Amino acid sequence: PVHLENDANCVGLSELLAHPEIENAACVVIGTGIGGTMIINGKLHRGRHGLGGEFGYMTTIAPAEKLNNWSQLASTGNMVRYVIEKSGQTDWDGRKVYQEAAAGNALCQEAIERMNRNLAQGLLNIQYLIDPDVISLGGSISQNPDFIQGVKKAVEAFVETYEEYTVAPVIQACTYHADANLYGALVNWLQEENQW
């Protein structure tokens, strides 16, 4: 038998596999766009239309950039596009942006800080929307400890600046990083076959 599931939902299922003690969690998958899922009371929350956790569709206000959702504003894909537009060079990818930033490239540092700030805003929205035990970040970029640290620092900066934020989200990398959707697909299959 074959069972299908949304890839971001599979990431959430993989976190249930790795951390069965977690009751409430959000998983945010960052790549060319942003995907996500919610775990509520230890179960995947799909919502009425199957859109539960589709955080990338959260509306943002960035009229100067003509971007209207979090996926367009805060993804790795947008970070790379920003560097391409500002530099006029097309041979960029996320890994190169981080390498050049570490070597002192001011444009790449700016692009990363911009992405981190935009991610932090969305992560704080998620924190105050569902109050999860943890928010796990996935996608290939989650393997980069500098990325995780940068996002945490951006969240901390918002929390320190605005006294209304009394709780900061617990942020971590997805346990299985870029392979999380594969492990989650296995969990989905086992659940559908009543073996989990």
Name each model feature, range by range:
Residues E15-N24, T60-W196:
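ATP-binding/phosphotransfer module of carbohydrate and carboxylate kinases, centering on a glycine-rich
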Residues P1-N68, G184-W196:
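Phosphate-binding/catalytic loop of phosphoryl-transfer enzymes
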